[in-house]
Amino acid sequence: MKASELRAKSVDELKTELLSLLKAQFGLRMQLATQQLAKTSELKKVRRDIARVRTILSEKAA
């Protein structure tokens, strides 16, 4: 997800997005632990998306 798309969302939408990304990250970590994850790059993508959302949230809070 692009930062420009995230900046257009409200704070509540961003918090919802963050929660869903954290759940996705947890699921991917469990798949990795049980050797079921084929695309390990998905973990990196989700981690970066989480960082983007948290950055935008802190920008909006300031």
From Swiss-Prot:
Matches recorded under SUPFAM superfamilies: Ribosomal protein L29 (L29p)
Alphabetized PROSITE patterns for the sequence: RIBOSOMAL_L29
InterPro entries the record matches: Ribosomal_protein_uL29, Ribosomal_uL29, Ribosomal_uL29_CS, Ribosomal_uL29_sf
GO CC list: cytosolic large ribosomal subunit
Residue ranges the record marks as coiled coil: none
GO molecular function: structural constituent of ribosome
Keyword Ribosomal protein among UniProt keywords: yes
GO process terms (BP): translation
Alphabetized UniProt keyword annotations: Ribonucleoprotein, Ribosomal protein
UniProt record similarity statement: Belongs to the universal ribosomal protein uL29 family.
Identification of the protein by name: Large ribosomal subunit protein uL29
